[in-house]
Amino acid sequence: MSDATLSLKQRLGGRSLYLVGMMGSGKTSTGRPLAEQLGYGFVDADAVIEQAAGCSIPEIFERDGEAGFRALESQVLNAIGQRHSLVVATGGGVVTQQENWGLLHSGIVVWLDVVPEQLMQRLRADSTVRPLLQTEDPDAALNALLNQRRPLYAEADLTVVINQETPLAVADGILQLLPSLLKDPTQRRTD
């Protein structure tokens, strides 16, 4: 760990980083190297939800509907929030539940804002079943979700705009933005 990263870790004081953004934005693939560089633990909230439910997210949606999934997601987020020094890859819709924001803001919220065209390409190439895109027009569904969630994601402490950067490059960008946020937490940062 470099001296700068060690200093950053000390200044974070154990506060967790919560990565938010649309499905396919790279929260998990960015979160792993970010956690490793900071010497933090890494948690994929969706994986914890699946473990808690004993089934996949599409199965949870099918069995309990979106409302049931969101309730479980909030419970899992509260459990994760009891720990410190984590990088947490959240689910794409975590920001839609007002009760989640108190916990998210106990740490530092980082929005991975993927350029819409790039996001569509990523999701088309990904074999993961996305319950909210199981419609006749997935592109229209994605655009509707983006329009609904953008103002919510914009409440993040840091925004990192992503086009074709690798997850490691995105993690490095977050590490470069964090010191200025810690100096002046009233200023949201965008890269």
From Swiss-Prot:
Keyword DNA-binding attributed: no
Catalytic activity entry: shikimate + ATP = 3-phosphoshikimate + ADP + H(+)
Gene Ontology CC annotations of this record: cytosol
UniProt keyword list: Amino-acid biosynthesis, Aromatic amino acid biosynthesis, ATP-binding, Cytoplasm, Kinase, Magnesium, Metal-binding, Nucleotide-binding, Transferase
EC number: 2.7.1.71
Cofactor or coenzyme needed: Mg(2+)
One Pfam family cited in the UniProt record for this chain: SKI
Domain of life: Bacteria
Binding of Mg(2+), residues: T28
Keyword Cell division: no
Compartments, as annotated in UniProt: Cytoplasm
InterPro entries per the UniProt record, alphabetical: P-loop_NTPase (IPR027417), Shikimate/glucono_kinase (IPR031322), Shikimate_kinase/TSH1 (IPR000623), Shikimate_kinase_CS (IPR023000)
Sequence positions that bind substrate: D46, R70, G92, R149
Entry's cofactor comment: Binds 1 Mg(2+) ion per subunit.
Residues that, per the record, bind ATP: G24, S25, G26, K27, T28, S29, R130
Pathway linked to the protein: Metabolic intermediate biosynthesis; chorismate biosynthesis; chorismate from D-erythrose 4-phosphate and phosphoenolpyruvate: step 5/7
PANTHER family on file: SHIKIMATE KINASE, SHIKIMATE KINASE 1, CHLOROPLASTIC
HAMAP family: Shikimate_kinase (MF_00109)
Description of how the protein assembles with itself and partners: Monomer.
Cited function: Catalyzes the specific phosphorylation of the 3-hydroxyl group of shikimic acid using ATP as a cosubstrate.
Family: Belongs to the shikimate kinase family.
Protein name: Shikimate kinase
Provenance organism: Parasynechococcus marenigrum (strain WH8102)
Gene behind the chain: aroK
